[in-house]
Structures are given as structure tokens and as C-alpha cells.
Amino acid sequence: MTATTVVMLLLMGCGGGFLAGLLGVGGGMVLVPFLVMLFDHAGHDPAMVVQTALATALATIMFTSLSSMRAHHRKGAVQWNLVWLLAPGILVGGQLGSRIVAWLPGQVLAVAFALFVGWMGSRMLRGARRVEPDVPARLPGRLGLAAVGTGIGVLSALFGAGGGFVTVPFLNSRGVPLPKAIATSAACGFPIAFSGTLGYMVMGWWQGLPGGALAYLDLRALFTVVPMSMLFAPVGAY
């Protein structure tokens, strides 16, 4: 990698980590477009560029989410009961999503990613729902939350995201105050990223990617981004 590429990855790590702490989104949405351009310029197989970018972005979230989760936990904002109820579905969904990605053409994934970002951006522009402090949250039961977790896991693996773009609006729409929704989403980031990354490694193991890659993961990009993302995630959380 050139010095310019390293600097850009470090900056993306700073931005992704800050957003992970601030919004509970994991930073993947910021990283994926840049990584696609980076891997394409580096001469990666065009058929696997998008998959490699998605997998690498998702792997960074494993580390970033731990840093962000710790900061939110210290503030007492994480709703751990919801995390445990969402986690089983998330783990299943991450495996399903990574397997879907392995069979989809890169161009289809790129278009789907752009549409998803546009849709979620429009939802964020509408603003958070105002929640009255005395009104209890209206959440589905155990099976309902497991189903929601599965959907979050699938979408996160498909789009290389930490799930915050889905988890935060869902929890907030059901009556969870925004700070607690963000903190809970940050805690869900680790099972999301772990399951999705594991799935990408299994599906990409025999793809013959270039040196510096482990299955679909580009290790050089991963370990350049991670230190800064972990450093800046607590900054966003506070």
C-alpha cells in the first residue's frame, strides 16, 4: 500500500470509529465505498471487489464495537436484556447474509448497497422519534425479537454494516429512547460482525484472493483501520 492509501485508511478508521460511538452504526457504511475503490485500484479480481470490501468492513466492526460497547456500558445505557434476545437471530442472520453475498454478482451488490444507503439516509433525515419517559417500550416477544435479529444479521452481512442503521430506528420506533437505542445497537455490533465475518471467511476460503488476504478479508486494510476506529469509538460515545 502507498503512503497515501495508509493515511486514507487511518482517516477512515477515525471517522468510522467516531460514527460507531455516536450513532451505533459500526462505521461499515463509511468504509465500504472507499474500500471498493481501494481494492479496485489495487487490481483485485473485479468479481470479488465488493465482497472483499464488505467482509473487511464487517471485520473492523468486531473491534470497533467492543470499544464503543464498553463506553456505552459505562454510561449504563445498554439494554442488555434486548441484546441477549436479539443475539440468537443476529448470529443466524449473519451466516445467511454472508452466504447470499458469496453467490451474488458484485454489480448487483453495489447497486443494492447504494439503494440501501439511500433508503436508510432518508429515514435518518426524518429524525428520531420523541419518546415519553413514562411510556413503556412496545417491543415484540422473544420469537419476534429473534426474527428481528435475523433480519438485522442478514442485512448487516449483505451491506457490511454493524446493524445500527436498522437496529436504532427499529428500537426507537418501538419506544426505546434514542440514547439507549444507540447504546444497545453498539452492543449488538459484535455478534453481528463476528457471525458475518465468520461466514465470509468460510465462503471465501477457496477464492484465490491476492497476498495479504484471508478468505474475503484484506488483512492489511483491516489492521490499518482498526487501531484508529477503536481509539475514536469512545470519543463518539461521549
Positions of predicted regions on the chain:
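N-terminal cofactor/phosphate-binding cores enriched in small/glycine residues
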Residues: 60
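Hydrophobic alpha-helical segments of secondary membrane carriers
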Residues: 57, 184-188
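Juxtamembrane transmembrane-helix boundary motif
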Residues: 1-23, 30-51, 65-159, 168-180, ...
